UniProtKB/Swiss-Prot annotation:
Protein's name in the database: Cytochrome P450 94B3
Gene symbol of the encoding locus: CYP94B3
SUPFAM superfamilies recorded: Cytochrome P450
Membrane protein topology class: Single-pass membrane protein
Protein species of origin: Arabidopsis thaliana
Entry's transmembrane regions: 2-22
Length: 506
């Protein structure tokens, strides 16, 4: 089997080399002024492999050297990749010429096995129809109210008790794991009307959680393969990681389909008064069925389960390194929490929102996102794009560009989000272009759950910090790992201590 796999890969490479060698050298070398060293036939694969363990830092270093903040990374056997941190380019890709930069088949191939025809993995009519439905539902007061009640219940009756027990017993907890479990509970309740009860740490890991983790990780690693033929061949032969991925996806699809069938049955025999407010019930009521509705809810679970937990994990760690910032958050949230933190109170938490934005600027939940050019084009900075090129905007690198954020771009400074230093008067967040800070995408594909995500994060940060001190066990700087959603390598091991001030009310 191993010999056959090697032979097939070698045959594919020979084909690619022949194709490349027959192409015009002039065409290959357009736009190669900035980027890693590139050689005939093999492109930049030598530099890529050398820096594969530090791709984020490597791309950022290369982009800093480019006057246009755009680089070209040609790789053997793959499409040309254009990477940019230029906001003008980002706006052009995500808005101005949106229809020329769809996700494209190469992207949908990566995630198609898992996400199927869900909103985050399709283009054209399928995307627009799902987008219209999702935008309507996320804009309704009833869904926001339902989501807030789910959030409040999960925080007060599960998250806080888990942290209280850790504080009383003195055990070490992985805060990243706790927040991921919490987020999975919330997103499943809101999306499916189903409670996986992941924060019960005495129970085995839910099979759906385990399968989601495995499927997401292997799918993400497909994108980092320098030669796509490797994972595609493994998929055809059903061996190695691709076999493991197929099994995990089967588990996800089977379990979610069972939940969908049960929900549909309960709605059919129930009365109007018993109708649920979760997204699945709403999608079924709109006439969606079968694999279509399954793929839709899987996409929303995938989008919501790790993004907020990743952002909160990094913020909680950053606050342990910045006592003055933590103190300002407490000054903001303590008066609100003392009266019972409500939905309207979240609008008053401007400084907390600035801290969350600053954490996501430095450690974006999604490090990069790629589109594929439908036709030849020219970006605003003059970069020529060929049909089929992969065009990537790079939030991780954008957050570290001095040209965008100043000489302190690598420092954690929430005050940069205000027009002036927050003082005794209510601080006002200044408008920041979503094309400079595209962590929630921008343009027609801007995240429909953006405001709901901020609602969740602000409520959790306020509820946790007002009650507990978080003390990292390890003083080493955490390692940022980019997958489908970035996470902290090894988790965030902490001790939990109750706060000594008057709000210690649990």
């Amino acid at each position: 089997m191993a010999f056959l796999l090697s032979f097939l890969i070698l045959a594919f490479l020979i084909t690619i080399i022949f194709f490349l060698s027959s192409s015009s050298t002039k065409k290959v070398q357009e736009n190669t002024t900035y980027g890693p060293p590139s050689y005939p036939l093999i492109g930049s694969i030598l530099s890529f492999n050398k820096n594969r363990h530090r791709l984020l830092q490597w791309y950022t270093e290369l982009l800093r050297l480019s006057p246009s903040q755009t680089i070209l990374v040609p790789l053997l056997g793959n499409r040309r990749t254009i990477i940019t941190t230029n906001p003008l380019n980002v706006e052009y890709i995500l808005k101005t010429n949106f229809f020329n930069f769809p996700k494209g088949k190469p992207f949908t191939d990566l995630l198609g096995d898992l996400l199927g025809g869900g909103i985050f993995n399709v283009d054209g009519h399928s995307w627009s129809s799902q987008r219209k439905l999702a935008s309507h539902e996320f804009s309704t007061r009833s869904l926001r109210s339902f989501a807030f009640e789910v959030l409040k219940d999960e925080v007060e009756n599960r998250l806080v008790p888990v942290l209280s027990t850790a504080a009383d017993v003195g055990t070490t907890v992985d805060l990243q794991d706790v927040l991921k479990r919490f987020a999975f509970d919330v997103v499943c309740k809101v999306s499916l009307g189903w409670d996986p009860d992941c924060l019960d740490l005495t129970r085995p890991v839910n099979p759906l959680v385990e399968a989601f983790d495995t499927a997401a990780e292997i799918s993400a690693r497909r994108a980092t393969e320098p030669i796509y033929a490797v994972w595609k061949t493994k998929r055809v032969l059903n061996v190695g990681s691709e076999r493991k991925l197929r099994e995990a996806i089967r588990t996800v699809h089977v379990l979610v389909s069972e939940i969908v069938r049960a929900k549909k049955k309960s709605l059919e025999i129930g009365t109007g008064a018993e109708a649920k407010q979760d997204l699945l019930s709403r999608f079924l009521a709109a006439g969606h069925n079968g694999e279509a509705v399954r793929d839709m809810v899987i996409s929303f679970i995938m989008a919501g389960r790790d993004t907020t937990s990743a952002a909160m994990t990094w913020l909680f760690w950053l606050l342990t390194e910045n006592d003055d910032v933590e103190r300002k958050i407490l000054e903001e949230v303590d008066p609100l929490v003392s009266l019972g933190l409500g939905f309207e109170d979240l609008k008053e938490m401007a400084y907390t929102k600035a801290c969350l934005c600053e954490a996501m600027r430095l450690y974006p939940p999604v490090s990069w996102d790629s589109k594929h050019a439908a036709n030849d084009d020219v970006l605003p900075d003059g970069t020529r794009v060929k049909r089929g090129d992969k065009v990537t905007y790079f939030p991780y690198g954008m957050g570290r560009m001095e040209t965008l954020w100043g000489t302190d771009s690598e420092e954690f400074n929430p005050n940069r989000w205000f027009d002036s230093e927050p003082g005794s008067t209510r601080p006002v967040l200044k408008p920041i272009s979503p094309y400079k800070f595209p962590v929630f995408q921008a343009g027609p594909r801007v995240c429909v759950g953006k405001e709901m995500a901020f609602m969740q994060m602000k409520y959790v940060v306020g509820s946790v910090l007002s009650r507990f001190e978080i003390v990292p066990v390890n003083k080493d700087r955490p390692v940022f790992v980019p997958l489908l959603t970035a996470h902290m390598a090894g988790g965030l091991k902490v001790k939990i201590k109750r706060r000594s001030h008057i709000l210690n009310n649990v």
